[in-house]
C-alpha cells in the first residue's frame, strides 16, 4: 500500500558506477534536517522503537558521498543501516528493475528490495514477520487482489 505501481522498464545502463561519482566528498546535512532527524530519533527512543535507516537503489539521485553521510549518522546513533545502493538485493538488475532509467524502481525492483528487507528485518533484527490479526490479514489480501485487478484492466 503506497507504491505507485509501474511495470514499465527503462534500464539504467551503467550498473553501480553511480556510487563512485561523489569524488570522495561527504554530503552535508542541513541543520534543519539534522534537527528533524533528532526529533524522530528521540521519539523512537522514548517509545522503545528501534529506528532503522534505509536507502533504496536510486542511480540518478544517490552517490557514495550521500551513502557515507548516512553511514556516519547510523554509526553516531548506533543504528542499523541498510544501504541498497552499495549492496543491491539478490535478483536486482538495473537493466530490468527501473521504470525511468535509474531514479525509481518498477514493480520487480521494488519487490526485490521488499523481499530482501523483510528477510533482513526478521533475520538480523529478530522482528516477527507480522502481528496483524486474522481480520487485518484478510483485509490486506482483499486490498491486494483489488489492486492487482485494477492494474490489469
PLM features per residue range, with description:
Residues 28-31, 57-66:
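Acidic-and-aromatic substrate-binding clefts and catalytic sites of carbohydrate-active enzymes
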Residues 1-47, 134-153:
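Secreted/periplasmic serine-hydrolase-like ester/acetyl group-modifying domain
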Residues 40-62:
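Active-site segments of SGNH/GDSL-like serine hydrolases
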Residues 7, 16, 47, 60-63, ...:
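Detector for Asparagine
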Residues 64-153:
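C-terminal regions of proteins
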Residues 20-23, 27, 53, 96, ...:
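A near-ubiquitous, low-amplitude feature marking generic local secondary-structure context
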Amino acid at each position: 500500500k503506497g507504491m505507485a505501481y509501474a511495470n514499465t522498464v527503462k534500464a539504467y545502463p551503467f550498473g553501480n558506477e553511480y556510487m563512485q561519482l561523489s569524488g570522495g566528498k561527504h554530503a552535508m546535512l542541513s541543520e534543519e534536517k539534522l534537527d528533524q532527524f533528532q526529533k524522530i530519533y528521540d521519539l523512537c527512543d522514548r517509545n522503545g522503537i528501534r529506528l532503522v535507516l534505509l536507502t533504496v537503489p536510486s542511480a540518478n539521485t544517490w552517490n557514495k558521498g550521500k551513502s557515507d553521510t548516512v553511514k556516519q549518522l547510523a554509526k553516531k546513533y548506533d543504528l542499523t543501516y541498510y544501504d541498497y545502493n552499495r549492496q543491491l538485493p539478490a535478483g536486482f538488475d538495473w537493466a530490468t528493475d527501473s521504470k525511468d532509467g535509474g531514479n525509481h524502481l518498477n514493480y520487480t525492483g521494488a519487490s526485490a528490495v521488499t523481499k530482501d528487507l523483510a528477510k533482513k528485518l526478521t533475520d538480523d533484527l529478530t522482528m516477527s514477520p507480522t502481528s496483524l490479526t486474522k481480520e487485518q490479514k484478510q483485509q490486506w489480501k482483499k486490498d491486494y487482489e483489488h489492486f492487482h485487478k485494477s492494474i490489469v484492466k
